[in-house]
């Protein structure tokens, strides 16, 4: 047991001495050496630079999956404006089918008009009671 303690103390002392030798060789202007962007580019190896670029890039639109599902890869502002014009009668009717009497959200399908929703809720309640 005493041998293990002696080895541990020797190891700690040798690492402390080694760290002091490294500290003595360092300049005080360490951070000012890296201020030039050319030095950073030269010092950074190519795979590391490529890795940083991959981390920093934004996800492509087709890679984004939100709460409402997958987005179209070709969706744009112009398409959204054309869709709004078609809905409000200022343009041609789009090929997409729009249901205005129901809404599908996180809690499931809901009717937008309250009378139909109450009727379907009562029918579901009656079916469960039987």
From Swiss-Prot:
The record marks 59-60, 63-67 as: Cleavage. GO terms for biological process: associative learning; cellular response to nerve growth factor stimulus; chemical synaptic transmission; inflammatory response; long-term memory; negative regulation of heart rate; neuropeptide signaling pathway; positive regulation of action potential. GO terms for cellular component: axon; extracellular region; extracellular space; neuronal cell body; neuronal dense core vesicle; synapse. Tachykinins are active peptides which excite neurons, evoke behavioral responses, are potent vasodilators and secretagogues, and contract (directly or indirectly) many smooth muscles. The lineage of its organism: Eukaryota, Metazoa, Chordata, Craniata, Vertebrata. SMART domains: TK. Residues 1-19 form the signal peptide. Residues 20-56 form a propeptide. Disulfide bonds: none annotated. One of its GO terms (molecular function) is substance P receptor binding. Pfam families: Tachykinin (PF02202). Belongs to the tachykinin family. The modification Methionine amide is found at residues 68, 107. The keyword Secreted applies. It comes from the Eukaryota. It is found in: Secreted. Keywords: Amidation, Cleavage on pair of basic residues, Neuropeptide, Neurotransmitter, Secreted, Signal. This is Protachykinin-1. The gene is Tac1.
